[in-house]
């Protein structure tokens, strides 16, 4: 009888130990995932840096932080430039001379914009950067929008 009781006690203790190890491993996995998620969210271009989504209209769209623009941004120069959305869905940007913006890290005055739906493994969507903010074009069922991010957004 004592022998059976010892066997049952040892079996229960063994299961509890294995179970505790599994829980510790599971908890550690959750904590690692959580830390990685927070890091991705708070990154300079993470989701918490999102400050705007502005839909483009066909034709010329004046973009900047001044109230007289077609698309008013919450960050950046008063007059950033003009984004033109053609009837075939192609887009082009012409930057204002005083915008001090870059396109894909280069100081150019105009460029064709590639949206996220037409990006490839070798070519990301075109990124227009100005100060701590930037935007790239998204395509949602044929609608084109500017996804605007700021690395200094209060939400980060």
Predicted regions and their residues:
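N-terminal pre-domain segments of enzymes
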Residues: 21-54
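Bacterial N-terminal signal peptides
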Residues: 5-16
């Amino acid at each position: 009888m004592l022998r059976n009781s010892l066997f049952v006690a040892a079996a229960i203790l063994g299961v509890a130990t294995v179970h505790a190890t599994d829980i510790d491993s599971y908890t550690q996995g959750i904590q690692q995932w959580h830390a990685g998620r927070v890091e991705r969210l708070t990154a300079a271009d993470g989701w918490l840096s999102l400050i705007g989504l502005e839909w483009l209209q066909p034709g010329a769209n004046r973009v900047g932080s001044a109230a007289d623009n077609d698309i008013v941004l919450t960050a950046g120069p008063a007059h950033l430039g003009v984004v033109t959305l053609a009837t075939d869905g192609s887009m082009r940007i012409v930057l204002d001379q005083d915008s001090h913006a870059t396109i894909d890290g280069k100081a150019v005055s105009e460029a064709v914009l590639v949206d996220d739906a037409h990006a490839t493994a070798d070519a990301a969507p075109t990124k227009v950067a100005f100060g701590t903010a930037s935007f790239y074009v998204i395509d949602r069922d044929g609608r084109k929008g500017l996804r605007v991010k700021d690395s200094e957004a209060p939400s980060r």
